[in-house]
């Protein structure tokens, strides 16, 4: 498998690339040092911080017995085996720490980056064990099912005939704002699986995919059970532990965080706002807009409702308009901790209070909002864990590799390599298209147009001194003529490209095929496509291949992986 690493700073997909903050966080630049110092507690590139984190976590007290018993029960219910059990049992020891990641529940596991997160957590845990053999590190995947954004969770996408095919499960007996985890599938799920499988590559692996999906997704089953059982089947050879945070047993462990949020609200929101201002002063955008109260209330029907604070000592559950005093809210949390659900601000705090989190595996968006949370961690007396970027891949099939070869032939200079063409495609695809058409027609066409514009501008500028001595009022006319001459050349250039495009439809179609494969819907492939397309075509071994790649590469660069077969 040919692989190439691309710097995030040089990637700009057609619609949306990676944020400036994430590019700086993964770069080797002075901006990174400032960002780390202002926004985080630990730097995953500094070895001294690793010893510091080991000491900090070893000194903290966790409810390990309760945590282990809960995880054993949950993973057994999800279909976990001996690998999960052995990994969970290690957490009884104060010398065992967690490498945590997680993702919102998605149909058939959702997009590729869900899989990449899990793989990265597994590999980072292995690497820490090799560095610190006296400690154990276990990978934990947080099942984010308390969200109520059903539409996002209930859809998935595969490639079919060089196009994208979308599949969506419609809500079934679902109340407004009901949590995704407890939403069930209707009889339609069987049809969706059959329709999707029919479009998957017709290989011996396709039957296995169909069987797995039908066994995990069936009428009456909940999103959480289906997602969790699928993940454990995919990672059956790995010690990945799943965690459901919606259970009462987990909420009891997190209760002190909810208590402090109730007692101190809206203090956390003010701290996020202050940190956001600091972040913006560094030139970055703030992702998260905090609320006065940073948790939701889940009613007896499983509906996730906002909690507002109309006055300093009053909380109100929306839309029911139920009002409670601060004391009443504390009593409610004491009696029914399962009714409390952290929002995006409080969620990582809950995670790192309950779990001995050594490191969290995060995506680009998560890095952005975690940069706003340093003062919140300090408010709750917790050190932020290492924030390690998840593995990031673009999987390139042989037919797309052949398009890359053609682009090298058409647009490349002597010595132009595969990595050169990937850098060009990922930094400015539209320019690659333009160059490909122009170079196919005339190798120096783009250069000739640029030269024409420069020569016309220089010729007119040479007149400036003479014209200004004759009549200074001619200078604005000359300046306008320089602009018009450039526009004239650009008009001719555009018409030339259009004429050339008509002559090179086949090449354009191949480039379009590559664009759909590399940047579906104009964004990175990992944000759109489902893993089962690739499993059906290349088998379950693709997970081992990606795992091996992560062992050999740092996760702070994007990896292009050319698949074989």
Swiss-Prot record:
Highest taxon listed in the record's lineage: Bacteria
EC main class here is: ligase
Q: What is its EC number?
A: 6.-.-.-
Can you tell me which residues the record assigns to a coiled coil? 439-519
Question: Do the record's keywords include Coiled coil?
Answer: yes
One GO molecular function term?
Answer: ligase activity
Record keywords, A-Z: Coiled coil, Ligase
Keyword set includes NAD: no
Stated name of the protein: Putative cysteine ligase BshC
């Amino acid at each position: 498998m040919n692989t190439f690493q691309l710097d995030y700073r040089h990637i700009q997909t057609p619609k949306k690339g990676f944020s400036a903050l994430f590019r700086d966080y993964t770069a080797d630049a002075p901006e990174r040092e400032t960002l780390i110092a202002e926004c985080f507690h630990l730097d995953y590139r500094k070895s001294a911080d690793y010893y510091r984190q080991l000491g900090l976590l070893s000194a903290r007290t966790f409810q390990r017995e309760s945590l282990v018993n809960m995880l054993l029960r949950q993973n057994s219910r999800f279909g976990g085996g001996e690998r999960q059990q052995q990994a969970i049992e290690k957490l009884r020891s104060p010398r065992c720490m967690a490498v945590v990641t997680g993702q919102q529940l998605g149909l058939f596991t959702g997009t590729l980056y869900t899989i990449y997160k899990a793989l990265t957590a597994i590999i980072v845990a292995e690497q820490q064990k090799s560095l610190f053999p006296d400690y154990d590190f276990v990978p934990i995947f947080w099942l984010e099912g308390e969200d109520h954004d059903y539409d996002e969770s209930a859809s998935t996408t595969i490639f079919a005939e060089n196009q994208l095919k979308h599949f969506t499960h419609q809500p079934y007996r679902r109340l407004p704002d009901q949590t995704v985890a407890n939403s069930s599938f209707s009889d339609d799920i069987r049809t969706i699986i059959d329709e999707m499988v029919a479009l998957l590559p017709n290989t011996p692996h396709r039957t296995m995919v169909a069987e797995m999906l039908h066994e995990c997704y069936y009428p009456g089953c909940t999103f959480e059970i289906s997602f969790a059982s699928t993940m454990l089947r995919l990672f059956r050879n790995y010690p990945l532990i799943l965690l459901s945070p919606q259970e009462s047993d987990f909420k009891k462990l997190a209760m002190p965080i909810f208590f402090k949020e109730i007692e101190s609200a809206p203090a956390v929101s003010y701290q996020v706002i202050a940190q956001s201002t600091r972040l913006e002063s560094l030139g970055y955008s703030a992702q998260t807009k905090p609320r006065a109260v940073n948790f939701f209330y889940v009613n007896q029907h499983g509906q996730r409702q906002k909690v507002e604070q109309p006055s300093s000592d009053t909380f109100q559950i929306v839309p029911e308009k139920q009002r409670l005093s601060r004391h009443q809210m504390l009593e409610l949390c004491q009696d029914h901790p399962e009714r409390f659900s952290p929002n995006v601000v409080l969620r990582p705090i809950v995670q790192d209070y309950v779990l001995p989190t050594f490191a969290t595996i995060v995506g680009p968006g998560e890095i952005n909002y975690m940069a706003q949370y340093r003062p919140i961690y300090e408010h709750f007396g917790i050190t932020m864990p290492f924030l390690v970027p998840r593995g990031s891949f673009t999987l390139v099939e042989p037919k797309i590799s052949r398009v890359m070869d053609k682009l090298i032939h058409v647009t490349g200079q002597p010595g132009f390599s595969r990595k050169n063409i990937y850098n060009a495609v990922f930094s400015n695809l539209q320019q690659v298209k333009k160059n490909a058409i122009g170079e196919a027609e005339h190798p120096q066409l783009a250069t000739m147009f640029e030269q024409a514009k420069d020569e016309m501008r220089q010729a007119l500028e040479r007149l400036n001194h003479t014209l200004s001595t004759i009549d200074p009022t001619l200078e604005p006319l000359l300046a306008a003529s320089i602009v018009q001459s450039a526009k004239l050349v650009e008009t001719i250039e555009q018409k030339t490209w259009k004429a050339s495009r008509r002559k090179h439809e086949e090449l354009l179609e191949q480039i379009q095929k590559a664009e759909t494969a590399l940047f579906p819907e104009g964004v990175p492939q990992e944000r759109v496509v489902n893993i089962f397309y690739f499993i059906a075509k290349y088998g379950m071994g693709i997970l081992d291949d990606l795992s091996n790649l992560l062992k050999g590469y740092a996760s702070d660069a994007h990896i292009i992986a050319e698949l074989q077969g």
